Amino acid sequence: MAPATIVIDASAVIAVVTNEAHRPALIRLTEGAELISPFSLPVEVGNAFSAMFKRKRISLEKAKAAVAAYQQIAIRLTEIDLGQALDLSHRLDIYAYDAYLIACSLQFRAPLLTVDGPLRDAARRVEVKVLEVV
């Protein structure tokens, strides 16, 4: 059974909407849960697609279809404590976007769902529960 609330990051969203191998497990983990993410999620999703364009991993048409699928996922975007995020960024030596996700998990006392290894490791260093994708 999924936790009541789950913080989801762009790597997990991208894995779902681009039909990556983790997709079925990610969907199972989130069934029945409220998904939340920092306000930065749409920017991160867009950045992920632009990176895929540069690596020739996705066409514009497929990216637009994936974005349409993303827009159908019910994810509540939320503000975070920017001061706390900066503290986390400094303490954990991570980018602000990763710190936003960890701050969101701490603020809502909710586990983090990610397929990003470095983010997973940083979250665990401050005792944020990370949902495992099996």
What name fits each language-model region?
Residues 46-76, 80-82:
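Active-site-proximal, substrate-binding regions of enzyme catalytic domains
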Residues 10, 23, 42, 46, ...:
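A general structural signal for well-ordered alpha-helical segments in protein cores
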Residues 36, 76-78, 131:
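General small-molecule cofactor/ligand-binding pocket signal
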Residues 1-40, 53-64, 126:
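Short, well-structured N-terminal submotif of metal-dependent ribonuclease cores
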Residues 1-5, 38, 102-134:
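Acidic, PIN/NYN-like endoribonuclease modules and their adjacent C-terminal/linker elements
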